[in-house]
Structures are given as C-alpha cells and as structure tokens.
C-alpha cells in the first residue's frame, strides 16, 4: 500500500522545477496530524478537555484542545521553516516567520487548528482544516496582510484531517482529492481513498435545524423540500448533522449530500470563516466534483476584506447545492 510520503514524492517528481517546499509543508501537516491524533485519543485521561478560560478574536470561548492544536501547528511550521507566515482562527493577526528561511519561503498557510472542538468531550469526531497559498509579497521580505487576503481560487493546496474512528488526512493540490488513513501500528498514513469523487446527487442534508426560525426564507424552503415525499427525486432526504464541519463534509464527500451553514438573524454574514473554513472546504469540494457557494456566489471567487471574515456556506453534491441556490435566488432582495 502506498504511503503518504511515497505519494508526495511521486507527485513532486511530476514537476521537474519543483524544489520541495510544498512537499515539506505537507510533511509538517502530517506530523501535526500524528501529534493531535495521539493527544485526542487520550483526551479523557489528561487535562486537555473543557474550556481554557480564554476568548478568541471572535469572542468565542477557546477550548483547551483548540489552543493545544493551534500551538502545535505553529511550532511544527516554525521548526520546519517551510512557510513565510501563518494565520489561524485562534489568533487575531497573522504571524510572520521572520527568519532568513521564513522570509525566503514561497508559501503561507491558514488554518482552523481544531474544528468542532466543543464535541471532543463527548467523543465526537473533530478535525483540522488547512489552506496553502503562494505569497504575493516579494521573496526575501516578511509577509504582509496582502499575502493572506487572497481569494480561494488562488489556493495551491488545501485539506483537512478528521479524527474519528480512524484518523484520515484528505487533501488536494488542484489535481483531484486523495485520502490517507493513519495506521497507528506503523505510524504511517496510507493511501486509502484515491481520486475521491463526490456523487452528483445526494440524499443527505446537514444543517442545524434548531435554528430554523432564524434562517432566510430560501433556506426554510429548501429544508421543506428535503422533507417532502417524492419518489422521483428519492425524497424525503435524510437529515444528518454532527456539528463538526469536517466530519459532516467528510461524510457527504463520500456518500453525497449538502452541508449548509447559512446566514441567520443572529449571524447576518454567516458564522463560518471564509479564509479558514470556507475556502479550503470549497476547493476540496470542487476538486471532487462538488459545488460550494454562499447561496448566490461561488465561494472561491469571493474577495476577502478581513482576516476573520465570515461567510454563509452551501457545499456538497452539485444537484443539491444548485437546488438550494435556486431557492435562495427566489427570495433575493
């Protein structure tokens, strides 16, 4: 069975001018995945569950594991010096790696270090999301905010790690999506899901229906559509919502479905972050044959205006996302 290391080397060999920087970043992420996998698996036995008592830049209480994952990723990237800078959902500003190697590095990375961390103390799947861009500031100088404020269509790689019944690393470099399952007996990620494709049609819708009254009319209509009985379209669909974006998206990637986190009266711009969640998940979805929009626009074409900008997200099987967007358009003001 092919390992992640072998796969990365093979892909790098397809580009004669490649110098291995991107491969080095992926190796750092692989290391991060192993460390977080180890600590999550013993979370109930160590003092890393619960709240840290600190709020992040969004005013949300940070879980202890959020901070652990954030600090672990920052340390792994700084040690390898393969990136010029790093931005995290858990930090107010970006971090420039202001060393000689850091200033001469070509890439920057944005991450949600631990998505769904509020679920960890009840043993529900969580994940890490990452997004990699080529910097736009001059090589040899420290990175600037402009390097991080790029639309998703400029990503060179993106992926996630899902920590569940097994730990999987799923990523794309713009040439399809591949998944690697961690074998703890040998400490290696092995290629288990080659060229992943999201079904064009799906039967699963994932949304927090407890917030129904706060949703836009187009979303309410789509939920009712999913619940109606119609043999021709195999409805009603199945409702499945874990509350962890990575876990919900991973299931829908494999089985077909739609994940929706819309705007709401209490979150008029949506709740998910464009740069840390929306763009990388959208890149993966499109590379697997799916679609990702904010209800009206392609996610990857949105020009960011702030490092922690929020965005509504409709992502999944093509037919389902297009139907939801059609209903959103009906009520567009």
From Swiss-Prot:
CDD domains (alphabetical): FBPase
PROSITE patterns, per the entry: FBPASE (PS00124)
Positions that bind substrate: 115-118, 208, 241, 271
Q: Where does Mg(2+) 2 bind?
A: 112, 115, 277
Annotated binding of Mg(2+) 1, by residue: 89, 112, 114
Signal sequence, start to end: none
Q: Enumerate the catalysed reactions.
A: beta-D-fructose 1,6-bisphosphate + H2O = beta-D-fructose 6-phosphate + phosphate
The protein's matches in InterPro entries, at most eight in alphabetical order, are given as: FBPase_C_dom, FBPase_class-1, FBPase_N, FBPtase, Fructose_bisphosphatase_AS
**What is the required cofactor set for this protein?**
Mg(2+)
Report the main location listed first in the record.
Answer: cytoplasm
GO CC terms of this entry: cytosol
Q: What is its EC number?
A: 3.1.3.11
Which pathway does UniProt place it in?
Answer: Carbohydrate biosynthesis; gluconeogenesis
Q: Which family does it belong to?
A: Belongs to the FBPase class 1 family.
Subunit notes for this chain?
Homotetramer.
Q: Which HAMAP family match?
A: FBPase_class1
Q: What is this protein called?
A: Fructose-1,6-bisphosphatase class 1
Native source species: Haemophilus influenzae (strain PittEE)
Gene behind this chain? fbp
